[in-house]
């Protein structure tokens, strides 16, 4: 990477402008810039331009905008019958914004297929700060003994939610977290869940890949709009089975049937 002519962001100036996401490199694909810091001002500026940080310990902060972009329309989440059986069988409790740091820390744990993690302690500190400011949110899945077994976190901006990472300690726990997130986003009027990188796992649940230029157009549109006033309020309740049934009734996906 040392031979790449890459824009460098001044770490002392959080207002230092990002290059356009349209100018991202072809190799490494989607790399926009390096350097800077993880201050709230810079992070929110990045997300507003369709750019996010992704790097490993020991590297400079690297900023990305991949093409194509992974997205999921909240009302198009596919509830497969196996996931529906899990919902009916498991006595799990789902909350949001009750354990943001614990969710991030769990997401940072090494996976069986990877030795390291991109969720560094600096990242945890930065996103916890955004959570305190009301910009970052989490969904938590708890087992019947009160153990945290799954979750997801991300950034909210207008009617767009940027999903960052999720984890699972029990089969389907992360899928349940993503389902509840999608359902709440849909009810609250959000139009798009940005999953950043396309994947077969997310495509199985209704995700898709769209060209970056299309994503940036949606980004500009939806970040200028506002979700429902009760979005992310702790007293908001949602019957997930009623939501799933309503989506099946609208023809969103035949596998969503509650029967």
What are these regions (language model features)?
Residues 1-259:
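N-acyltransferase acceptor-side catalytic subdomain
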């Amino acid at each position: 990477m040392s031979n790449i002519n890459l824009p460098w962001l001044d770490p002392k100036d959080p207002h230092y402008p990002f290059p356009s996401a349209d100018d991202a490199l072809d190799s490494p694909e989607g790399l926009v810039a390096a350097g800077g810091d993880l201050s709230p001002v810079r992070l929110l500026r990045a997300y507003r331009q369709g750019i996010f940080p992704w790097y490993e310990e020991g590297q400079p902060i690297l900023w990305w905008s991949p093409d194509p972009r992974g997205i999921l329309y909240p009302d198009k989440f596919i509830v497969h019958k196996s996931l529906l059986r899990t919902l009916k069988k498991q006595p799990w409790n789902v909350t949001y914004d009750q354990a943001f740091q614990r969710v991030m820390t769990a997401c940072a744990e090494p996976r069986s297929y990877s030795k390291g993690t991109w969720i560094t302690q600096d990242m945890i500190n930065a996103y916890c700060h955004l959570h305190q400011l009301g910009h970052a949110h989490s969904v938590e899945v708890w087992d019947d003994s009160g153990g945290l077994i799954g979750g997801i976190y991300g950034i909210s901006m207008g009617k767009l939610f940027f999903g960052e990472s999720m984890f699972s300690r029990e089969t389907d726990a992360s899928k349940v977290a993503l389902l509840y997130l999608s359902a709440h986003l849909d009810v609250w009027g959000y139009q798009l869940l940005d999953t950043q990188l396309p994947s077969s796992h997310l495509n199985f649940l209704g995700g898709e890949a769209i060209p970056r230029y299309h994503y940036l157009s949606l980004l500009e549109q939806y970040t200028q709009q506002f979700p429902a006033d009760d979005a992310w309020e702790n007293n908001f309740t949602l019957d997930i089975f009623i939501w799933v049934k309503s989506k099946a009734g609208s023809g969103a996906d035949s596998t969503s049937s509650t029967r």
